[in-house]
Amino acid sequence: MKKMLIGGIRLYQKYISRFTPATCRFYPTCSAYGIEAIETHGALKGSYLAIRRISKCHPFHKGGLDFVPPKKDKNDDSGHTCKAHHHH
């Protein structure tokens, strides 16, 4: 599934995007973001992140730097705030 989605984005980049004016208001571009999101988070969550990014593409959003969030390690509880599990 990941390969199909990324393949679709690459087809867009090769056959459509290169023939349109560069108007992306974000870095990285939405297509590059989509590929990275799918590679990092898998087909389902990556697609969700890509769609969410594309939905920001309108004149009322300032754009700018918008990187794919890192994948959270399921065993990493560094963001966990409950102190009940921590022993000193």
Swiss-Prot record:
Cell compartment(s), UniProt: Cell membrane
Upper taxonomic lineage: Bacteria, Bacillati, Bacillota, Bacilli, Bacillales
Region (Disordered): 65-88
Keywords, in A-Z order: Cell membrane, Membrane
Top-level lineage group: Bacteria
Record membrane topology: Peripheral membrane protein
Protein name in UniProt: Putative membrane protein insertion efficiency factor
Family: Belongs to the UPF0161 family.
NCBIfam families the record matches: membrane protein insertion efficiency factor YidD
Biased composition (Basic and acidic residues): 69-80
GO cellular component: plasma membrane
Function recorded in the entry: Could be involved in insertion of integral membrane proteins into the membrane.
Segments passing through the bilayer: none
